[in-house]
Amino acid sequence: MSEAIYTVTNPATGEVEETFPTATDDEVMAALERAYAARERWRKVPLEEKIAIIERVAAEYDSRQEELARIIGDEMGKPYGDATGEVWLSGDIHAYNAKHAPEVLADEELDLGERDGRAYMRKEPVGVIVGVMPWNYPYYQVARFAAPNLMLGNTILLKHAPQCP
């Protein structure tokens, strides 16, 4: 465990909301190794199961809208209306990805013009995707990164901004 910590301070009150230890190099490597180990299992999960998981995430955003909005209001000073809008949008991103995954991830036949044969474009997972998130839209930025990558079959590792870890 690192001796350095992230401190989340409510900008409106100056009060410390939470502290988190900064990950050590060894902890980061261990997290990468776990994500790498999970990638072979996750890429083989049937699309229908991935859709169900992403739909549950969308439902969590919907059912916890007030709580999640309050958290980013306290942690980063986001006005309540903006915060609830971000929570709604983040849930909607997950719902959209779940709903449209079958057609978005379907193989696409390519036009070969006058050439003989057939060619297809297939979307395949590439492995572990690392996302370094900015501070200003903590739910939205994660949703737009996580939902499509998880639907495709990639595993992800997030590094949140220090203002709202």
Please name every model-derived segment.
Residues L110-P165:
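Conserved small-residue-rich beta-alpha loop and adjacent elements
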Residues M1-G117:
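N-terminal Rossmann-like NAD(P)+-binding subdomain of aldehyde/semialdehyde dehydrogenases
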